[in-house]
């Protein structure tokens, strides 16, 4: 969260004419499903059993649909953000969504955004970029995002949530968040959004030239 990968990936996909896939949104949608159905998303057995009733679709306009309903805004609420990281560690949830992600990538030219794409979801992807930024920089970006929505988040709380999520995601038993050996690392700590988009676009174009 806050490294800028979603915003950058979305913009780069538009520039290159690729389809943008936000895998994090899919995990958020699963979390939201449990809340809508009135059960605890952290009840792993119940959530795993419910997966067969969940249909998630993404469109080229960045909308996310949960069983036909547009939940693009609902999945961005802070309550969902806090619960999604533990939910994404559940093996059955990961298997369910990874299968959907691979299916989509097979049929389209995509830029896929997520925390284990290059190592687990698409290990043979032509281009892998591992985007990083300091926790402090990421927390400031998240605070600005919430303020733009009219919310008043506490910087220290956001910073701690980011650090906790990083720890959980890099230490989970199934497909932890690590940089793929063949990934290019891009540190956006000292970049604004436009610079991040430009750097990423150039990396992709250079790599595509190499692959010709």
Language-model segments: residues:
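Glycine-rich phosphate-binding loops of nucleotide-dependent enzymes
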Residues: 128-136, 142-145, 178, 185, ...
């Amino acid at each position: 969260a806050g490294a800028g990968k979603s915003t950058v990936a979305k913009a780069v996909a538009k520039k290159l004419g690729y389809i943008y896939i936000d895998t994090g949104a899919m995990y958020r949608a699963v979390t939201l499903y449990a809340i809508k159905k009135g059960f605890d998303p952290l009840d792993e057995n119940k959530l795993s059993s419910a997966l067969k009733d969940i249909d998630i679709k993404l469109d080229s306009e960045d909308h996310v649909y949960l069983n036909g309903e547009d939940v693009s805004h609902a999945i961005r609420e802070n309550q969902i953000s806090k619960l999604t990281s533990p939910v994404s560690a559940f093996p059955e949830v990961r298997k369910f969504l990874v299968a959907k992600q691979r299916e989509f990538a097979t049929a389209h030219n995509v830029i896929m955004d997520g925390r284990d794409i290059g190592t687990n979801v698409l290990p043979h992807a032509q281009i892998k970029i591992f985007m990083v930024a300091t926790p402090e920089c990421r927390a400031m970006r998240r605070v600005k995002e919430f303020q733009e929505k009219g919310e008043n988040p506490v910087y220290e709380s956001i910073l701690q949530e980011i650090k906790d999520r990083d720890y959980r995601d890099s230490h989970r038993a199934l497909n932890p968040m690590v940089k793929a050996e063949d990934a290019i690392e891009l540190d956006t700590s000292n970049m604004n959004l436009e610079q991040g988009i430009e750097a990423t676009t150039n990396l992709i174009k250079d790599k595509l030239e190499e692959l010709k």
